[in-house]
């Protein structure tokens, strides 16, 4: 703090030098003239003296003021100063100013004399608004209160001696002078109002008694004066009356926090999300995410949790849990009480297994006395067929599974639904890879085996070799002390077939096969497909109960009402008992082969359960895709070259064939080339398949199906390649060649013409003759043909006759009519298409 002289301090505080010297002397600071300087220590002592003792200094000055020459007003100016320590950095103090009181009283007296002049009084009243503005700005500096017919002045401007420094001398003096002037104006304004009010009251009370005490008027009430001062403050700077300002009321939202945490019982189901779990525990999802993070699990509020993790979270947060039984509905619907029904003996379900071309279908064909093999391409069974055969000693239901390794999954499903396995082994070929696979499936399903050693009519047949090879694979014949019956048969001559059937029936007696013939039916789906005009068609093997037309059934994720039933001979039936294969119509979709079939009394529950199964299947598929993406991401890390992908869209005639081909193609994937089947289905190739192929640059493969006209036009425009197959060997071999880069760019098989059947005639010489219109290409007499129904291949063979009117023709071109006779095939119908193709040379 800089040194300051007594004169400078007097000038800044607007005090007389003598008065200031006396005040300094009273504080113990001896100074004789205005030129003496105050040291920082003396200034500090001055501040301490002022702040100590009392914070409130009271001064009172009483003067008399004459009014109208008759009355006097005793003006008592009582002054209080309160020093508040607002901020430590701004320590304030107050200097007593007794000299100011006399000056202020003199000013008030002079102004009261002016009141006598009415014009001046009105002018002063008009100026109250300006005084009011100044008063608001100095609200914390001065708040005058009138008491006992005088004036009580509070909070006169504080003189902050601590801030008196050399640099701020002029500013401090100016602010102090301005504060004193404003306070005096405030006193004067209220005095004027009081005097005016008094005069008005005197005029009204002229007739009343004179006032006592010689004062001439009654003492003013402090409350009334305070109200008067408040009225002066209720006008704004423009003269308008102010409204009363009320502090806004804040609504308090209060609640009582529970002393103890509420323990909840949370029902946990599989796949519960974090948000669902938080909702059940009445907490925020972020809290559960924190708990998971502490457990080392990164999760979001929409992520699904397994039951074990959810249980740990619930226990960690102090709640109880109960596990939700998701199979409650399924158990309530599918479990049938058969305690009141009696069991009866049923026919055995026999599955014929063996290596390809060992004579399985030929053996079954001989048993059924039909020509099944002649209707199948290449002599290979393409999908499971179920047939019921009646013998002299009882009925037998046969399931004919394909022998090719691609149909492993189909054979596995067949083994699950069968009672006895007939293992067909060619006597001239011995045990082959598919033979070993059939043995493994039969043993895994714990199904007894009956070995049929086929083709014993061939000169090179060696049944003993077959027995020894099977014995090495733990299939021991009865003659060697085992439990497996061996029967030598010939599907060509029929030798030993009767002995084989007798062995099967004998084995079934040992098994004591029984089933419930009454009650709601249960079974298994053998095969399914989608037919145009009929919708989803499923081949079902009834295992228990009685399946009737009109029953509500549930097959996997599909449900429906049985609209019609056909047996293995194609005849309509009303009911089917145990061990009976039937073909049913009326399902909502195509079920997967191997799905269980159950009859449900309530159609609503069947629909609900189907939706629940579908949701589970969808969630499982999504989880599997996520895991595959993750594994692919790690597998592809660190590889130098990019893996080539062969994209395929696969369409087939039946569900089982599509699944088997899909598995075979996926097994062909290598580190360099990956087979990716982006879509698969049953039925004809449609325009949507072509659109998908264009978007994904995929090859469209049809197995025993063709593309419809819209798909063909779109494929020609977009340049999509169709490849048709009816032999699975050729399909797999071509895909292998494509993967290795050895596939020839030329088509091995080319369709040269298509004729549409418009009408069917009968001929005594050729049988059924199809009246056709050639709609594409050219139909040649010498080329092989296929018969398509709803774009699905139903027959393959050659033309027996081709006529234009009554004349024989070697070829018929597009737009012309012709008559076509198909060799060894009479089931031609209107709407069928006859496809003519040729085999091109491979380069």
UniProtKB/Swiss-Prot annotation:
Domain of life, source organism: Bacteria
Region (Disordered): 198-219
UniProt feature, compositional bias: Basic residues: 207-219
Keyword Nucleotide-binding set for record: yes
An MF annotation (GO) of this entry: GTPase activity
Region called G4, residue ranges: 454-457
Chief location of this protein within or outside the cell: cytoplasm
Residue ranges of the region described as G2: 379-383
Native source species: Francisella tularensis subsp. tularensis (strain WY96-3418)
Family: Belongs to the TRAFAC class translation factor GTPase superfamily. Classic translation factor GTPase family. IF-2 subfamily.
Name of the protein in question: Translation initiation factor IF-2
Domain tr-type G: 345-512
Residues engaged in binding GTP: 354-361, 400-404, 454-457
């Amino acid at each position: 703090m800089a040194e300051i002289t007594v004169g400078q301090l007097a000038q800044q505080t607007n005090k007389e030098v003598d008065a200031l010297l006396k005040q300094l002397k009273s504080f113990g600071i001896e100074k004789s003239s205005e030129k003496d300087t105050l040291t920082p220590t003396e200034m500090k002592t001055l501040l301490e003296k002022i702040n100590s003792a009392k914070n409130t200094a009271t001064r009172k000055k009483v003067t008399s003021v004459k009014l109208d020459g008759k009355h006097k007003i005793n003006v008592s100016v009582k002054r209080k100063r309160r020093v508040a320590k607002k901020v430590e950095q701004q320590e304030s103090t107050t200097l007593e100013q007794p000299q100011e009181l006399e000056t202020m009283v003199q000013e008030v007296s002079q102004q009261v004399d002016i009141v006598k002049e009415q014009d001046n009084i009105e002018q002063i009243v008009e100026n109250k608004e300006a005084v009011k503005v100044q008063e608001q700005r100095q609200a914390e500096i001065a708040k005058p209160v009138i008491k006992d017919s005088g004036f009580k002045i509070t909070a006169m401007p504080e003189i902050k001696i601590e801030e008196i420094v050399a640099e701020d001398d002029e500013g401090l003096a100016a602010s102090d002078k301005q504060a004193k002037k404003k306070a005096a104006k405030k006193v004067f304004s209220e005095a004027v109002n009081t005097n005016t009010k008094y005069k008005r009251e005197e005029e009204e009370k002229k007739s009343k008694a004179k006032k006592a005490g010689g004062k001439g008027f009654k003492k003013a009430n402090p409350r009334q004066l305070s109200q008067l001062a408040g009225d002066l403050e209720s006008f704004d700077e423009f003269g308008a009356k102010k409204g009363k300002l009320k502090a806004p009321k804040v609504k308090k939202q209060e609640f009582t926090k529970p002393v103890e945490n509420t323990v909840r019982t949370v029902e946990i189901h599989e796949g519960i999300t974090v948000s669902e779990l938080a909702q059940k525990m009445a907490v925020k999802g972020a809290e559960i995410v924190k708990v998971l993070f502490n457990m080392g699990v990164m999760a979001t509020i929409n992520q699904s949790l397994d039951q074990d993790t959810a249980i740990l979270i619930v226990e960690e947060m102090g709640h109880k849990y109960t596990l939700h039984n998701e199979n409650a509905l399924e158990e309530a619907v599918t479990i049938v009480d058969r305690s009141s029904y009696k069991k009866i003996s049923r026919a055995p379900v026999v599955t014929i297994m063996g290596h390809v071309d060992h004579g399985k279908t030929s053996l079954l064909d001989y048993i059924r006395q039909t020509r099944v093999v002649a209707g199948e391409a290449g002599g290979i069974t393409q999908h499971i067929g179920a047939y019921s055969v009646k013998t002299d000693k009882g009925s037998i239901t046969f399931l004919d599974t394909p022998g090719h390794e691609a149909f492993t999954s189909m054979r596995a499903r067949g083994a699950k639904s069968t009672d006895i396995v007939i293992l067909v082994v060619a006597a001239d070929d011995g045990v082959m890879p598919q033979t070993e696979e059939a043995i493994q499936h039969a043993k895994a399903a714990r199904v007894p085996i009956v070995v049929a050693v086929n083709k014993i009519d061939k000169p090179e047949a060696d049944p003993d070799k077959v027995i020894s090879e099977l014995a090495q694979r733990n299939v021991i014949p009865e003659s060697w002390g085992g439990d497996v019956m061996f029967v030598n048969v010939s599907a060509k001559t029929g030798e030993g077939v009767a002995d084989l059937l007798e062995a099967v029936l004998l084995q079934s007696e040992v098994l004591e096969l029984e089933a419930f013939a009454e009650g709601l039916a249960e079974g298994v789906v053998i095969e399914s497909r989608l037919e145009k005009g009929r919708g989803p068609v499923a081949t079902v093997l009834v295992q228990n109960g009685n399946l009737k037309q009109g029953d509500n059934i549930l097959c996997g994720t599909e449900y429906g009402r049985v609209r019609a039933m056909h047996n293995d001979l194609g005849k309509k039936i009303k009911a089917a008992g145990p061990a009976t294969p039937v073909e049913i119509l009326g399902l909502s979709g195509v079920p997967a082969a191997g799905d269980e079939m159950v009859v449900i009394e309530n159609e609503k529950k069947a629909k609900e359960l189907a939706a629940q199964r579908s949701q589970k299947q969808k969630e499982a598929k999504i989880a599997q895709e996520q895991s595959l993406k993750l594994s692919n991401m790690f597998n592809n890390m660190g590889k130098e070259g990019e893996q080539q992908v062969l994209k395929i869209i696969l369409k087939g005639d039946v569900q089982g064939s599509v699944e088997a081909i899909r598995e075979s193609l996926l097994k062909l994937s290598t580190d360099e080339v990956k087979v990716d089947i982006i879509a698969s289905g049953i039925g004809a190739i449609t325009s949507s398949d072509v659109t998908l192929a264009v978007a994904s640059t995929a090859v469209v493969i049809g197995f025993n199906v063709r593309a419809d006209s819209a798909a063909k036009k779109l494929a020609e425009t977009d340049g999509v390649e169709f490849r048709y197959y009816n032999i699975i060997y050729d399909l797999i071999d071509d895909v292998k060649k494509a993967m290795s880069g050895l596939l020839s760019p030329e088509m091995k098989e080319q369709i040269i013409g298509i004729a549409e059947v418009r009408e069917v005639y009968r001929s005594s010489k050729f049988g059924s003759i199809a009246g056709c219109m050639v709609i594409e290409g050219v139909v040649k007499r010498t080329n092989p043909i296929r018969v398509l129904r709803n774009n699905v291949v139903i027959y393959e063979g050659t033309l027996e006759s081709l006529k234009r009117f009554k004349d024989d023709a070697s070829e018929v071109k597009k737009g012309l009519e012709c008559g076509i006779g198909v060799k060894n095939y009479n089931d031609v119908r209107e709407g069928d298409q006859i496809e003519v193709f040729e085999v091109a040379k491979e380069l």
